[in-house]
Amino acid sequence: MILLDGSAVAKQIREELKEKIKNEPRKPILTVIMVDSEKSGPSQIYVRNKIKAAEEVGIDVSVINIPKTVKEDDLIKFIGAYNERLYLTDGLIVQLPLPDHIDEHKVLNSISPRLDVDGFHAQNAGLTLAGKDCMKPCTAYGIMRLLEAYNIDVTGKKVKIINRSMIVGKPLASLMLNKNATVTVLHSKSLNIKKECRSADIIVTGVGTPNFIKEDYIKKGA
């Protein structure tokens, strides 16, 4: 069994980015919009991690806090100002989740695909599916970069992905297919997940449950 060290690969990528950014005429700017997130909630932790990672490589981060009472149309108009004035930022993230009265799909699709660094816009999702150059969801793309760093060729491999979200499972399935893997997407309604996994060369799980995959789910050499 090979241990894939994601932290080591991430560190290497950050060092490469740091050198690249250092030679640019100006620092890139990342804008993060937060709609009334709890000060100690998960969203704050995610954003703090993003800020830390960005600043380590030389990216300036602007965090904008908006009251939870904001109307959906007003939030979309606010985002539109960044779409129309591309000098304001190089990338835009709307931190999820949003309040119940706001349609996340509408808001995410109001971001210019060029600024959509999360890769959630429908245009970027379609381009990811088609195997074209675009902004890709970070977790899915990170998994591909991790495999690449260890020279793991997925061509012809049976890949089982236990996640069907738009953030991980679906884009990862597209990226794997574009690299000629044979992909099966499993989820909470799938029958006999153990049997499915036993035939896999590569298993990717994103179910958020520790020890979900047991030793006897994995075939020798996977």
Positions of predicted regions on the chain:
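Short, well-structured alpha-helical segments in soluble
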Residues: 74-87
